[in-house]
């Protein structure tokens, strides 16, 4: 187990949000439904309770064991890569413009 697992999980939620709530799309729901049974992490019941927690736990695995994720759940791996590719300077700026005052 990695010391910083919780932060990677929470960053997974943040990635999903900044990428356009990708964890709540019908496309990701299809990935979730087809691959959640293949999730083998110790937080299995928590991680597979809904698509948002599954995405966040999968980001944790993407960071800590990407080759395992890619081999065992290739659609999930591809969805995370797609989410990362949606992060643009414009999206980051929009989030900063909206939420910046709360973070100051």
Task: Indicate where each model-derived feature is located.
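Active-site-flanking segments in enzyme catalytic domains
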Residues: 1-104
């Amino acid at each position: 187990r990695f010391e910083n697992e919780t932060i990677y999980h929470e960053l997974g939620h943040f990635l999903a949000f900044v990428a356009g709530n990708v964890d709540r799309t019908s496309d990701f729901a299809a990935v979730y439904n087809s691959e959640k049974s293949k999730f083998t992490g110790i937080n299995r019941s928590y991680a597979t309770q809904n698509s948002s927690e599954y995405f966040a736990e999968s980001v944790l695995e993407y960071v800590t064991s990407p080759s395992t994720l890619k081999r065992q759940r290739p659609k999930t791996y591809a969805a995370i890569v797609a989410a990362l590719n949606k992060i643009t300077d414009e999206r980051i700026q929009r989030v900063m413009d909206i939420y910046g005052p709360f973070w100051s």
